[in-house]
């Protein structure tokens, strides 16, 4: 599939179980992000597209948008954590984050939501939690199990 180009970042879209798609891009574009949001969680990140869109939006809200490509302000004190149950997806998201202007505020982990929740301190809070969750119940299964895991509700998060 190659590279999907956004306004100020690119998403490599080769190994993730769930590729960049219209649903995810629309979700990222329509999310209400507040300038006060500092700790965000993306559940089921896939390629990391929605987390990257949130990082770009926060950068625009908190800092003055830069007109020169590649010269992007980075808001301080912001952390966006992205988790995915698929190892290849979490790895690809990590690479996409590393190659973005906001690498210092983005991180990805290969972990389930239940396992991740168990690692959090009781006082840990997120200002914003978002997800483009699996939404098929009994639809036609794909030949690749990883794709089914990212598309069907039976596998959980």
Predicted regions and their residues:
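Glycine-rich SAM-binding Motif I of class I
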Residues: 48, 52
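Conserved SAM-binding loop
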Residues: 93-94
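A short acidic, Gly/Pro-enriched loop at the edge of an enzyme's catalytic core
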Residues: 119-128
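Class I SAM-dependent transferase core
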Residues: 1-35
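Conserved class I S-adenosyl-L-methionine
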Residues: 37-44
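Conserved SAM-binding strand-loop segment of SAM-dependent methyltransferases
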Residues: 102-115
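Conserved SAM-binding motif I beta-strand of class I
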Residues: 79-84
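Mobile active-site "lid"/loop adjacent to the S-adenosyl-L-methionine
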Residues: 133-157
């Amino acid at each position: 599939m190659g590279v999907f180009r956004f306004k100020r970042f690119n998403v490599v879209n080769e190994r993730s179980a769930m590729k960049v798609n219209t649903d995810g891009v629309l979700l990222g574009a329509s999310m209400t992000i507040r300038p006060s949001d500092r700790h965000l969680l993306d559940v089921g990140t896939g390629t990391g597209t929605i987390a990257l869109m949130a990082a770009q939006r926060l950068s625009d809200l908190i800092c003055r948008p830069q007109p020169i490509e590649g010269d992007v302000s980075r808001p301080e004190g912001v952390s966006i954590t992205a988790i995915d149950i698929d190892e290849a997806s979490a790895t690809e998201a990590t690479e996409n984050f590393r190659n973005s202007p906001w690498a210092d505020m983005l991180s990805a982990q290969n972990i389930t939501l239940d396992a991740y929740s168990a690692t959090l301190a009781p006082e840990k809070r997120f200002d914003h939690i978002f997800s483009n969750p699996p939404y098929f119940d009994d639809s036609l299964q794909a030949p690749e199990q990883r794709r089914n895991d990212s598309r069907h509700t039976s596998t959980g998060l």
